[in-house]
C-alpha cells in the first residue's frame, strides 16, 4: 500500500494495466491477408486495404481519455522512451515542438481517418464490441478490453488477436487503486483494513484480474 506518511490517506492497488494494445478481429484480418502490425506503416497499409473494401479499420470512441490513450501509444511508438519522458514528464519545450512531434500528429490524423462517423462520444466497450462482431478490424485499447472478449466467450488466436502497439520495446501502464482516507471511529478503520485485506488476497487478485484483463498487484 502507498500512504502519505499516514497523514490523510492510504492507497491499496488492485491491478496493473498495460495500456498500449491492439485488439483485432481474427476473421476480418485472416480473410483479408493481414497480420498484426509491427510498425505504424504496416498498420497504415493494413488500414488502407481494409478501408478500400468498405471495412472500418479502427473502432474508436472519441472521448477525451480514449483520444489520450491513442495519442500516448502513438507518441511512445514513434518517439520512443526518451522522447516520451522528455515530452510528457519533463514538458521539454524543444521536444514538444520537434519534428518528431509533427510525425506523431501526422499519424494521429491518419488514425482519425480510419475511424467511422459514429466515433465521437462512443464508449470504449461499444468500440470493443464492434471488433468482436466484425464491424471493425482493430481497436487500440488497454488490456481491460480482454474482459469484454472473455465475457463474450471469445478466445485469443481463435476469435481475436491482441498485440502491443508498435514501439521500441517501451510500454505504458497504470495502476487502479482504492483510496482509504484517514477517518475517526475504530469500527470504520477496521472496515477499511478488512476491505484492503480482501482486495489484496491471493484468490481475489487471481479471479478479479483474470476477468479484468490486468496484472495482479500481488502475485
What kind of feature is each model-predicted range?
Residues 31-32, 113, 151-215:
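Extracytoplasmic/periplasmic substrate-recognition and gating elements
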Residues 47-50, 89-120:
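Glycine-centered hinge/linker elements that transmit conformational signals in sensory
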Residues 1, 35, 78-103, 151-155, ...:
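Short, solvent-exposed loop/beta-turn-alpha elements that line the ligand-binding surface or hinge
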Residues 2-36, 44, 63-89, 172-181:
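Periplasmic solute-binding protein
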Residues 31-36, 109-123, 135, 153-159:
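A local structural motif
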Residues 124, 141-146:
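Beta->alpha turn/N-cap motifs
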Residues 40-45, 118-133:
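Short helix-initiation/N-cap motifs at beta->coil->alpha
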Residues 54-57, 133-142:
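Alpha-to-beta junction loops
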Amino acid at each position: 500500500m502507498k500512504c502519505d506518511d499516514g497523514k490523510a490517506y492510504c492507497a491499496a492497488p488492485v491491478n496493473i494495466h498495460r495500456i498500449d494494445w491492439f485488439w483485432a478481429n481474427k476473421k476480418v484480418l485472416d480473410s483479408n491477408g493481414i497480420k498484426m502490425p509491427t510498425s505504424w506503416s504496416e498498420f497504415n497499409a493494413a488500414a488502407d486495404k481494409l478501408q478500400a473494401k468498405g471495412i472500418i479499420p479502427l473502432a474508436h470512441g472519441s472521448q477525451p481519455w480514449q483520444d489520450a490513450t491513442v495519442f500516448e501509444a502513438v507518441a511512445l511508438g514513434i518517439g520512443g522512451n526518451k522522447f516520451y519522458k522528455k515530452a510528457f514528464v519533463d514538458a521539454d519545450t524543444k521536444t514538444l515542438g520537434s519534428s518528431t512531434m509533427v510525425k506523431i500528429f501526422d499519424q494521429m490524423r491518419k488514425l482519425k481517418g480510419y475511424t467511422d462517423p459514429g466515433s465521437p462520444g462512443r464508449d470504449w466497450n461499444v468500440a470493443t464490441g464492434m471488433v468482436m462482431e466484425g464491424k471493425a478490424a482493430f481497436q487500440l485499447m488497454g488490456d481491460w478490453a480482454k474482459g469484454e472478449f472473455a465475457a463474450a466467450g471469445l478466445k485469443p488466436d481463435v476469435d481475436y488477436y491482441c498485440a502491443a502497439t508498435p514501439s521500441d520495446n517501451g510500454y505504458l501502464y497504470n495502476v487502479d487503486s482504492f483510496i482509504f482516507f484517514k477517518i475517526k471511529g475504530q469500527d470504520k478503520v477496521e472496515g477499511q483494513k478488512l476491505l484492503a485485506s480482501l482486495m489484496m488476497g491471493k484468490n481475489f487478485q487471481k479471479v478479479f484480474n483474470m476477468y479484468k484483463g490486468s496484472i495482479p498487484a500481488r502475485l
